């Protein structure tokens, strides 16, 4: 059956979403993005170049195109209420309403929801609304804290005591952002990502993924939106036991049930970022959409019709039989401008070489007269797929190394050495 789908967003995540939808030749794609993503544009029937939060322009475009459904990529339009407005116009969405999106956009709401419903995995926390309250708690707390702005930060706004700042630095950072912060116990362990399709009641998990936030090899340098990620052929990670996986899945299932019980049912993609600690998985945060880069890992493995999954989520009858992933490993490597993230060099030309069997996803890149140029954020990503992690990494690394220009990437993502480092760290904690 023909289906017209609106895709909102223009990054690498949205290119992955668009490609997955386009695997069904009966699906017609219409796109809204602030800047033209050449990969998305080539797969779209029509493109509206407009800021994704400019809902007054998005709604008429969607209705004029006659779309049957929308898929929302980034978090900002969710916070702006794009799903509510689309549904008022008769267009259902893969994405939560503004109220349900608070699971990501309001960290205080998220923690209080978990506390009210007795959901496991919630770290010790304190919500502060002014700098003086934050100062008193930071200075009196026995241990290190994570200082988190209550609202959206693009994944780059958290300061961790003992890693980024000391006590005085934490107090100053809380003051700089106005004192509206969530202060949480610093979690020690290994991070992992569990994403799931959610129809308001039913939750179908995707393969586990591990992202790499630090800019440089060896996990050093400033935090970024994510330099790359990997997943294994068994859809697990070697430092996450089956028991800990089941605990994380239960936390997400309980969170969806809590949202439904409070009258704000959650429909869309639920992204759980967990720290696997000595006590088991703890929730670092929830996101109300696919991760970037993690979307590229899981959607590169999706064997089911993505448009069909969207339809089942909208209808509220999602079942495990609707979702199937290939039993393969994936490695995603982002190329970023020289100087990223602090002083990225924009407007530098790029040349793609022979990238073999890798999948290419365009992100913050501009095509002018047939030549690609860097912008100020992550440029493009390659995903390698293979029977083993080593095979997938070799495909991704060969592709990433084929690009010439003022860009760099982390060569260590997906290598046996970095995986063993993660496992050794987990063994030391336990």
UniProtKB/Swiss-Prot annotation:
Annotated residues for binding of Mg(2+) 2: 285, 287
Domain ATP-grasp: 111-315
Pathway linked to the protein: Purine metabolism; IMP biosynthesis via de novo pathway; N(1)-(5-phospho-D-ribosyl)glycinamide from 5-phospho-alpha-D-ribose 1-diphosphate: step 2/2
Catalyses which reaction(s): 5-phospho-beta-D-ribosylamine + glycine + ATP = N(1)-(5-phospho-beta-D-ribosyl)glycinamide + ADP + phosphate + H(+)
Enzyme Commission designation: 6.3.4.13
GO BP annotations, alphabetical order: 'de novo' IMP biosynthetic process; purine nucleobase biosynthetic process
Example GO molecular function: ATP binding
Residue positions binding Mn(2+) 2: 285, 287
Matching PROSITE patterns: ATP_GRASP (PS50975), GARS (PS00184)
Cofactor binding, note field: Binds 2 magnesium or manganese ions per subunit.
Assigned keywords, A-Z: ATP-binding, Ligase, Magnesium, Manganese, Metal-binding, Nucleotide-binding, Purine biosynthesis
Keyword Nucleotidyltransferase applies: no
Cofactor(s), names only, from the UniProt record: Mg(2+); Mn(2+)
Residues reported to bind Mn(2+) 1: 273, 285
Binding sites annotated in the UniProt record for Mg(2+) 1: 273, 285
Pfam families hit by this protein: GARS_A (PF01071), GARS_C (PF02843), GARS_N (PF02844)
Amino acids binding ATP: 138-193
Cited PANTHER family: PHOSPHORIBOSYLAMINE--GLYCINE LIGASE (PTHR43472), PHOSPHORIBOSYLAMINE--GLYCINE LIGASE, CHLOROPLASTIC (PTHR43472:SF1)
Family the UniProt entry places it in: Belongs to the GARS family.
This protein's name: Phosphoribosylamine--glycine ligase
Origin species: Methanoculleus marisnigri (strain ATCC 35101 / DSM 1498 / JR1)
Gene: purD
């Amino acid at each position: 059956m023909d289906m017209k789908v609106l895709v909102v967003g223009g990054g690498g995540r949205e290119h992955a979403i668009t490609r997955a939808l386009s695997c069904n030749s009966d699906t017609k794609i219409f796109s809204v993005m602030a800047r033209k993503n050449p990969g998305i544009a080539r797969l779209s029937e029509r493109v509206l170049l407009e800021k994704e939060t400019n809902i007054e322009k998005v709604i008429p475009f969607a209705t004029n195109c006659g779309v049957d459904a929308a898929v929302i990529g980034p978090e900002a339009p969710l916070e702006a209420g794009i799903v509510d407005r689309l549904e008022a116009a008769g267009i259902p969405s893969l994405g939560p309403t503004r109220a349900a999106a608070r699971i990501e956009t309001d960290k205080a709401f998220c923690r209080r929801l978990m506390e009210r419903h007795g959901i496991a995995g919630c770290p010790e926390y304190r919500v502060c609304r002014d700098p003086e309250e934050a100062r008193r708690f930071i200075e009196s707390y026995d241990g290190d804290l994570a200082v988190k702005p209550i609202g959206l930060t693009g994944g780059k706004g958290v300061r961790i005591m003992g890693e980024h700042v000391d006590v005085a630095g934490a107090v100053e950072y809380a003051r700089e952002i106005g004192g509206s912060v969530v202060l949480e116990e610093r979690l020690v362990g290994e991070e992992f990502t569990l994403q799931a399709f959610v129809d308001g009641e039913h939750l179908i998990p995707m393969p586990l993924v591990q992202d790499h936030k630090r800019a440089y090899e060896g996990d050093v340098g400033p935090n970024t939106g994510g330099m790359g990620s990997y997943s294994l052929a068994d859809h697990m990670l070697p430092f996450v036991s089956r028991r800990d996986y089941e605990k994380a899945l239960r936390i997400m299932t309980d969170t969806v049930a809590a949202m439904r019980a409070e009258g704000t049912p959650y429909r869309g993609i639920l992204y759980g970022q967990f720290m696997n600690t000595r006590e088991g998985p703890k929730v670092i945060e929830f996101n109300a959409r696919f991760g970037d880069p993690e979307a590229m890992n899981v959607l590169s493995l999706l064997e089911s019709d993505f448009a069909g999954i969207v339809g089942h989520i909208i209808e509220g009858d999602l079942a495990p039989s609707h979702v199937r992933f290939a039993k393969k490993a994936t490695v995603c490597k982002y190329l970023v401008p020289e100087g990223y993230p602090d002083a990225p060099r924009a407007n530098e030309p790029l040349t793609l070489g022979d990238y073999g069997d890798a999948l290419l996803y365009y992100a913050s890149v501009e095509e002018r007269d047939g030549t690609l140029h860097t912008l100020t954020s992550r440029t493009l990503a390659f995903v390698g797929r293979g029977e083993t992690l080593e095979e997938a990494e070799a495909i991704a690394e060969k592709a990433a190394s084929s690009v010439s220009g003022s860009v760099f990437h982390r060569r260590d993502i997906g290598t046996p050495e970095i995986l063993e480092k993660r496992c050794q760290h987990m063994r030391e904690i336990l």
